[in-house]
């Protein structure tokens, strides 16, 4: 069944009207009166039930569609019930609307009354507005003529004021122009006050621009004159300024700057001047490196002495071109120094001079925040041009590369002299110098490519010499003295070539050090090893002689180079020290095994002292030395004859360089070791009779004689010799005298303590006896211990002795016991 077409449409407006009536009107809310209580307001609204009704709730939606609702109703299967439900809702809404109209009837009447009052007020307002408009028209008509008159008079007054101002400014301009003419017509042009004229010039042009005086005939005539005078002022001021910069005259520079400041052109003029000097610096560098100009001036064209397209001169012209290049470089350095100092002088005056009227610092007008200083601008351009020219010379011209590489010390000397002169000439208290350390390093870095090439060439020359005298291909061949002298002479030449330059000297010394390291490695490869090199029983073999010669060569190199660097600063010694140490170690290696073998031989002879009977009382003692001492003497004499005669320097050359030779040092150490080793084992001899003491004294005398005559002067050995001379009379002292004897001051405490065991009872065992060690084993242990550690071992034996005495119930100790404790306690106190 179809729904009535009119049923959905009235329902929606009815719902909307109902929602409007639910809220009170604004007038009633604003009056503050509570709304009247009606049955409809107290009861629930029909819309509340509609919201929960599945059929009526779609009508409350803002997106309600009648077509969709009708389709849904037809599809539900009960359209009749739906239509009936809608009719009920319409009746309910109509009833609700009637109730609302009835309940709000007084309010509706009040609204109608308000509308009537508003209409009356609006009619009265229209009448008032019409009257006001009529009055305005009458006033406008009355005031139009006076306003026109006022406007006309105002224009006339403004024109008069403008004409008066123009006339006033024109008169002032003409007066300034007359003053400027008076200055320009001064009889002596050199005495014209340029700064005052510049001030007049600036004021005239400023007034003309500011007050638009151009176009006035008399002013235009004066402007022509002012313009001409301005050009003359600029020209004269620039001459004064440049003359002052060249002559470093602060007064002239200040005058020139003041003129341009008064002209209002200070910054542009200074920038232009600095750019000019930058261009001059760049051009100076370019001209100095212009090989075409050099060759044309030193030999001409492509004739003899000319230059080929490759950059290499013809035969016969190289020397002239080289000399011309160096002359141009020297001239370039002079020009660069003058340019930089001139710009610095300009900057110096700018930083000190202030305008006498405004007190403005001129430097602040020229250099704004973030701008670089004038000298920095010129220096940066100079360094850039110099770097470019040097790179071009290195890559484009092999001839120039060779000149600057071979003559790098001269090149760097020129640059450092330039830097030193600039620093010296611009070192003024209270003024920034022209260049700082960073700027100097930039200039030196410009020729870094030639420095690298020069150092490589230096190392290459030295390496070639080293490789030629120590070829790896022919092991066993030794260089001659002439070849060694050639190497030393070449090293000295390399140092002398750069000696005036401390920085370059250190760099060359590092290259020399690399060459010395290479020499030490190659020399070590030539050292012969094996048992034959350590034999000391027969004459020196050819292998040993080769090692001796190699040692002497390396010793000579070490001594000679050490004397070279002695006159250099200490840092030079620090640079070469590790490389000289490598040479020294290489020089020691051929002979150290020989001296060690000889020392072992002499120690084995001395150890035979323990096989002798020094405890016997033999009245028939002969005057001969002990057999072990005779063997030791023969060994020393043989070593002297066969080996030391070849190794030790002659008396004329013994102290040429003021340093001890390697073999002399090894011989001295061996002699000291023999003396100390002997008195150590002599102190361990037990028992020792009076006859044994005499025999031991005889042996010590023979030892002193053998060492002094064949090894090293014993009086130059120091402590070992004093110990030997003290031990000989010590053995003859009474035990009671030893504690106060000054002899023990020249002996190691362990020697005295070991000797006291000889004077003690048998039950007082020495550490060697207690630990059942052989003399050689005990001696090796002593070599690795300090005196306080040796005392600990001795103290343990003394404690054992005291325990034995106390265990027997004895109260008396051997006289040596308290004496040994006294010596040991003093040793302990010294180490605290």
Curated annotation (Swiss-Prot):
Membrane topology designation: Peripheral membrane protein
Positions of the UniProt region annotated as Disordered: 1-49
GO molecular function, one term: protein homodimerization activity
Ranges of Pro residues composition bias in the record: 1-11, 23-38
GO cellular component terms, semicolon-separated: Golgi membrane; Golgi transport complex; mitochondrion
Cellular location(s): Golgi apparatus membrane
An example Gene Ontology biological process: intra-Golgi vesicle-mediated transport
UniProt KW keywords: Golgi apparatus, Membrane
Major localization class: Golgi
Residue spans of biased composition, Low complexity class: 39-49
InterPro entries, per the entry: Cog5, COG5_helical, COG5_N
Domain of life: Eukaryota
Chain ranges passing through the membrane: none
Quaternary structure, from the entry: Homodimer. Component of the conserved oligomeric Golgi complex which is composed of eight different subunits and is required for normal Golgi morphology and localization. Interacts with COG3, COG6, COG7 and COG8.
Family according to the record: Belongs to the COG5 family.
Role, per record: Required for normal Golgi function.
Name of the protein this chain belongs to: Conserved oligomeric Golgi complex subunit 5
Species: Arabidopsis thaliana
Lineage: Eukaryota, Viridiplantae, Streptophyta, Embryophyta, Tracheophyta
